[in-house]
């Protein structure tokens, strides 16, 4: 690792791959804005009010072009921001350079080591002039985890003494290093946090678990379960970005192949649609009888991974779970089977068990795992997010939905935080509908307006909300 990274000091308050890429990044940011009407209109609505003035946001989310538009929306509304990526492969280096050149400290480049990743996660909490972050914007929960676990380790270092995987080895080492330098580094920073807004399913699971156990130290807004996030980003975003990643990585013809999608939630639904749309025969694995029935009713064959392992050509995990594809599954696969993950963490595929075999790196984020019999399994992005590791993630338009929710959630927690207990909340229905409304004109959609009589007949305000909270879209 670069020495400047180890000691957390740098002559400039950013670490990116190549600042000469900044002008290219700026051009793409300008293009992305034309596809992100929610963020652009939110800037316009709040630019005078400056609701985030005084907010110091520690951001941990994929450093893409679309995230750059989010960052510049937050700063336009008054926030100071420091940023790291939440995945070692997901940064778009020209985006990071453009944002750093504009003055926001960014610590991210594509292909970070795990040591660098966790060091950069610390850097977003290291503010100049004796100040501290007071808000977290998280994706996957790593920034939140870092402060909470570090605070526990201040009292008892045994909690970081037994790593179970290479990720924890790097995390625990980074915490040890910071505690040696400052025994109260984490609790000092944790005490200043007013709240967190969480982007994705995996991070939300962590928050709900902490709430259930009474360990959540500040209020949290679950952005993932806003309808305009989960039913759009997770579904339509994955429907476009999954096959983009697979095809950029492998140039494989998807038509005629058997593709297995593990998990039929919103992400899995989008993945299955895209693979079928390109002519694959799609099988689905599921643990939930409701999701399994949905898949079957859509015409997908519902099977087990044990059944599919030696028959399919392409495997995609979309569960948020652990070792959904294990060593024995990969050992049984056909020669040149493609294995990838679109869930947040790399634990869905048991990659560690294959390190005993020879790996042949074909190009960045594409590896052949060579089994003793000579068979090769093609692993994409080392089991991390294939759409961001091997492509550029979701399109700008759908990310405008998600990031408008993030912006509104940051405003809500920062300005109204005293109304919230240390629990997990979702944005109210009227804001969900507002986010959708902001995006209609861009795609030529025109709403029908209820008459007073019609609104009275179904018992809603003619301006919304139009559905009860329990409604399933």
UniProtKB/Swiss-Prot annotation:
Enzymatic class: hydrolase
Catalytic reaction equation(s): S-adenosyl-L-homocysteine + H2O = L-homocysteine + adenosine
Pathway recorded for this protein: Amino-acid biosynthesis; L-homocysteine biosynthesis; L-homocysteine from S-adenosyl-L-homocysteine: step 1/1
Reported function: May play a key role in the regulation of the intracellular concentration of adenosylhomocysteine.
Protein name per UniProt: Adenosylhomocysteinase
GO BP terms in the entry: L-homocysteine biosynthetic process; one-carbon metabolic process; S-adenosylmethionine cycle
This enzyme's EC code(s): 3.13.2.1
Swiss-Prot/TrEMBL keywords: Cytoplasm, Hydrolase, NAD, One-carbon metabolism
């Amino acid at each position: 690792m670069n020495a400047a990274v180890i000691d957390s000091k740098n002559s400039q308050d950013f670490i990116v791959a190549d600042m000469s890429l900044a002008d290219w990044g700026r051009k793409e940011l300008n293009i992305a804005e034309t596809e992100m009407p929610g963020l652009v209109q939110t800037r316009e609505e709040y630019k005078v009010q400056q609701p985030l003035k005084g907010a110091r946001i520690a951001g941990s989310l994929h450093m893409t072009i679309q995230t750059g538009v989010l960052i510049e929306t937050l700063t336009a509304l008054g926030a100071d921001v420091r940023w790291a990526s939440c995945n070692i492969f997901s940064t778009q280096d020209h985006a990071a350079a453009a944002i750093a050149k504009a003055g926001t400290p960014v610590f991210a480049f594509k292909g970070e080591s795990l040591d660098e990743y966790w060091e950069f996660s610390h850097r977003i909490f290291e503010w100049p002039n004796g100040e501290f972050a007071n808000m977290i914007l998280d994706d996957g929960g790593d920034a939140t985890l870092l402060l909470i676990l570090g605070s526990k380790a201040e009292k008892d270092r045994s909690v970081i003494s037994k790593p179970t995987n290479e990720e924890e080895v790097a995390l625990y080492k980074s915490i040890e290093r910071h505690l040696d330098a400052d025994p109260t580094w984490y609790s000092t920073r944790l005490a200043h946090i007013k709240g967190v807004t969480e982007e994705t399913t995996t991070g939300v699971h962590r928050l709900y678990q902490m709430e259930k156990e009474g360990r959540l130290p500040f209020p949290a807004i679950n952005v993932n379960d806003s309808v305009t996030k989960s039913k759009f980003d997770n579904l339509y975003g994955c429907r476009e970005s999954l096959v983009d990643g697979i095809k950029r990585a492998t140039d494989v013809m998807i038509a005629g192949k058997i593709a297995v999608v593990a998990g039929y939630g919103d992400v899995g639904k989008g993945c299955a649609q895209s693979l079928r749309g390109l002519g694959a025969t799609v099988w689905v694995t599921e643990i939930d009888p409701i999701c399994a029935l949905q898949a079957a009713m859509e015409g997908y064959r519902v099977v087990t991974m044990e059944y599919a392992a030696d028959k399919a050509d392409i495997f995609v995990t979309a569960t948020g779970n652990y070792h959904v594809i294990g060593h024995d599954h990969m050992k049984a696969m056909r020669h040149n089977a493609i294995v990838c993950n679109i869930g947040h963490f790399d634990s869905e595929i048991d990659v560690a068990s294959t390190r005993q075999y020879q790996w042949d790196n074909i190009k960045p984020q594409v590896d052949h795992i060579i089994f003793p019999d000579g068979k090769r399994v093609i692993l994409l992005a080392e089991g991390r997010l294939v759409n961001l590791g091997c492509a550029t993630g979701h399109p700008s338009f759908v990310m405008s939905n998600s990031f408008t929710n993030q912006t509104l959630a940051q405003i809500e927690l920062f300005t109204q935080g005293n109304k919230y207990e240390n629990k997990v909340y979702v944005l109210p229905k009227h804001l969900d509908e507002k986010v959708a409304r902001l995006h209609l004109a861009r795609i030529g959609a025109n709403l029908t307006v209820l008459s007073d009589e019609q609104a009275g007949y179904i018992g809603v305000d003619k301006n919304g909300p139009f559905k009860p909270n329990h409604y399933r879209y």
